[in-house]
From Swiss-Prot:
Pyridoxal 5'-phosphate binds at residues 108-109, 179, 207, 233. InterPro entries: Aminotrans_II_pyridoxalP_BS, Aminotransferase_I/II_large, AON_synthase_class-II, AONS_Archaea/Proteobacteria, AONS_Proteobacteria, PyrdxlP-dep_Trfase, PyrdxlP-dep_Trfase_major, PyrdxlP-dep_Trfase_small. PROSITE patterns: AA_TRANSFER_CLASS_2. Pathway: Cofactor biosynthesis; biotin biosynthesis. Its cofactor is pyridoxal 5'-phosphate. Belongs to the class-II pyridoxal-phosphate-dependent aminotransferase family. BioF subfamily. This is 8-amino-7-oxononanoate synthase. One of its GO terms (molecular function) is 8-amino-7-oxononanoate synthase activity. The modification N6-(pyridoxal phosphate)lysine is found at residue 236. It holds the Pfam family Aminotran_1_2. The gene is bioF. The keyword Transferase applies.
């Protein structure tokens, strides 16, 4: 089969299955609104949970950082790309989250891939929640370790898998708050199970850090758990981009020697690190923002009662409305756009077959009347 035939067949099948993805260039966008093709919408698809992407303190920090350090790092952190703002940010993150070290990555995807690729060896075992992010599952499947997936958020299922004897090291992988369902991992029993097997726990808390726990320290802090490997990202509640791994001194030094995503990639721009430092300050002092977000979540869930779709059991900013069929959820998303609500339809392979959904995300930037407008639109389109 020629390359062109393979590509065309894959695209045709993706269209026929109702799973074809498209991008929509947006104009002005923030945690509350966005514009597409000249039309303005209330934005219920962003991960800007605290509305910090347009916060003046964060924007000015990036501008001032760019004026001082330029707009790029100019090289790998192992060459000339590691500057004072990145070093300061790593120290601040480690101190804030109670770890010895933090290492910056250009994205959460890169952090997850780098850690698993560098840490795992033949005969090792990875036990991952079935609904973990694609970056985690892909890295695990490509590693030399054996991957076993346990039932979503089921410590008992994990315990059964862990009971089998193995030769190498054990790594348990989960998320703090799951990106497509919005529910929280049972971190305490999961961590205890890993420790009982002399294993380590890796938690990707992309959707928890900033929005839960004291000072927004995240899911692990909230549940009183300190995993051996903690990934936090800055593209959600922090409103910026990038990620960090929190770990021990020895683990950090090991990854600086063996994590190819760190060694062979241009480092995070110093100006970006300046913006993240400013966002960190906003997060630490952001109890009012978290209270506003919590109020918006409560308002939405109370008003969503009676909708025909299945509203997932979630108290996080991620509020999935399960519709099931791909074409139905696409039609519902279009009808919501007609009412000036931008809500993204999520379909397989991102979510399991038969669970296509509207992934509704809420922000502290939303106003009460924004939530009410969305609810009115959902109820109006529910039977169409």
């Amino acid at each position: 089969m020629a390359w062109s035939q393979r590509i065309e067949q894959a695209l045709v099948k993706r269209r026929l299955d109702g799973q074809y993805r498209q991008r929509h260039p947006t104009g002005q966008a923030d945690g509350r609104t966005l514009s597409v093709a000249g039309h303005n919408y209330l934005n219920f698809s962003a991960n800007d949970y605290l509305g910090l992407s347009h916060d003046g303190r964060v924007v000015r920090a990036w501008q001032q950082g760019a004026e001082r350090y330029g707009v790029g790092a100019g090289g790998s952190a192992h060459v000339t790309g590691y500057r004072a703002p990145q070093a300061e940010l790593e120290h601040q993150l480690a101190d804030w989250l109670g770890y010895r070290r933090a290492l910056l990555f250009i994205s959460g995807f890169a952090a997850n891939q780098a850690v698993i690729a560098a840490m795992m060896a033949k005969n090792d075992r990875i036990f991952a929640d079935k609904l973990c992010h694609a970056s985690l599952l892909e890295a695990a499947s490509l590693s030399p370790a054996t991957l076993r997936r346990f039932g979503h958020n089921q410590p008992s299922a994990l315990a059964k898998l862990l009971a089998a004897e193995g030769e190498g090291e054990t790594l348990v992988v989960t998320e703090g708050i799951f990106s497509m369902d919005g529910d929280r991992a049972a971190l305490k029993p999961i961590h205890q199970l890993a420790r009982d097997r002399d294993g380590w726990l890796l938690v990707d808390d992309a959707h928890g850090v900033g929005v839960c726990g004291e000072q927004g320290r995240g899911s692990c802090w909230q549940q009183g758990v300190q995993p051996e490997l903690l990934i936090v990202t800055f593209g959600k509640a922090f409103g910026v981009s990038g990620a960090a791994l929190l770990c021990s001194d020895a683990t950090a030094e090991y990854l600086l020697q063996f994590a190819r995503h760190l060694i062979y990639s241009t480092a995070m721009p110093p100006a970006q690190a300046c913006a993240i430092q400013a966002a960190l300050g906003c997060v630490q002092q952001g109890d009012d923002l978290r209270q506003r977000l919590a109020a918006n979540i409560t308002r939405f869930r109370q008003g969503a009662r009676g909708l025909r779709g299945q509203l997932a059991s979630s108290d996080s900013a991620i509020q999935p409305l399960i519709v099931g069929d791909e074409q139905k959820v696409l039609g519902l998303a279009r009808r919501l756009r007609d009412r000036r609500c931008w809500v993204t339809a999520i379909r397989p392979p991102t979510v399991p077959p038969g669970t296509s959904r509207l992934r509704i995300t809420l922000s502290a930037a939303h106003r009460e009347n924004d939530i009410d407008h969305l609810l009115e639109a959902l109820h109006a389109t529910d039977g169409e």
